Amino acid sequence: EAIGYIQAQSEHAQELLDFISSRFSSPTLCGLLLGKAARAREKGVELYFDPACRLDRPFQPLGEQELISIIGNLLDNAIEATQRSPLPHAPVEVLIKLSDQELIIEVADQGVGIKPEIRERIFERGITTKTRGDHGIGLYLIESYVTQAGGAIEVADNTPRGAIFSLFIPATGTARQLEDTDYAT
C-alpha cells in the first residue's frame, strides 16, 4: 500500500513537472511554480493549472523578479486563504497566459474571501486580511508592479466562496517601455 502511494505521488510530481516545463520558458518561474505546488500540497491544498497556461517567451513589460513576486504573492495568499477556510479545501485555480496583446494572470481560491470593507483598501500598504505575522506588503507590491506596466487588476468574489484575482498587463506600449525608450535616447 505504501509503495502504491509513493508511486502515485511520484507520477503526480512528474506530470506536474512535465506540464509546467512544457508551458513556461523561464527556469525561475518553473521552479517557483513547482515549489509553490509542493508547499501547497504539504498544507493540504492542491494547485490546479489551467490547460491554457502558457508563458513561453520573456515578458518585457515586467522584469523576471517582478513577475515572480506577483505570482508568488498571489499563490501564497490563495493557499493561506484556502487553509483558513473551515470547509473542505477546494483546489486553487491558476491561469498564466501570454497572448500577443496581454499577459493574464488569474488566481482563484475558495478560501475565506475578502470582506467588503477590506476589499476597497486591499492594495494599500499595511492592509491585510491575515491576523498574524508581518503582512500587508504583497498586494501593495503587486498593484505597483502592474500599474507601472500599464496593467489592471480585478478582484471578485468566487463561487461559492473565496476570491479571484485577475491581472491584465499589456504586452506592448506600457509606461515602462516608454520610459526605457526615453532613457535610451
Residue ranges, per PLM feature:
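Short beta-to-alpha transition helix within the HATPase_c
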Residues: 4-7, 21-43
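Short conserved segment of the HATPase_c
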Residues: 114-126
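Conserved glycine-rich
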Residues: 151-152
